[in-house]
Amino acid sequence: YTFAENLYEVYCIKNSACYFLIPSILLGIRRWRIMMVSSKGRYALRVMIYLAQNDREELIPLKEIAENQNISMKYLEMIVSLLHKGNMLISGRGKKGGYRLARKPSEYTIGSILKLTEKTLAPVNCLEGGKVTCEKAGYCITLPMWQKLDGIIDDYLETVTLEDLLEGRV
């Protein structure tokens, strides 16, 4: 995937991690920086996309989602619980129980989904939680660069919606 005239690329390794590769033009250096999205974040996106693709009034059983997405029931239960608590899914119990999106696909940004599932999207630890936590921040020469990169990542992920992914607009 590319954004803003090839300013970054995303690579996914099968059954492993996805990496955002940020080139030197953004970092002011001559190498790539890697930001990893966990399997929990990637699976949450897959679940949300599956539910958006199968948008219907009735609830979709967890077993159907697990089988279709090849995610273990135990791991999937944890992910949908997180998405439900974050008001992204509507759930129901019983024979006709399951899950569906709480809103239209156009109303979910990828950033909002990943922020719910990931501990942080910050490219460095000192920016976790949206504030600078490093004791060296007062004299850190690289801090402005990391803050700018954090803003670029956040801005981009907040512009891409589930609908954009479904329509191939990324």
Regions found by a protein language model. Give the residues of each.
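Short, hydrophobic-biased segments on the C-terminal half of alpha helices
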Residues: 80-81
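Non-DNA-binding regulatory cores of transcription-related proteins
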Residues: 102-170
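Alpha-helical residues within the helix-turn-helix
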Residues: 67, 84-85
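Beta-hairpin "wing" of winged helix-turn-helix
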Residues: 88-101
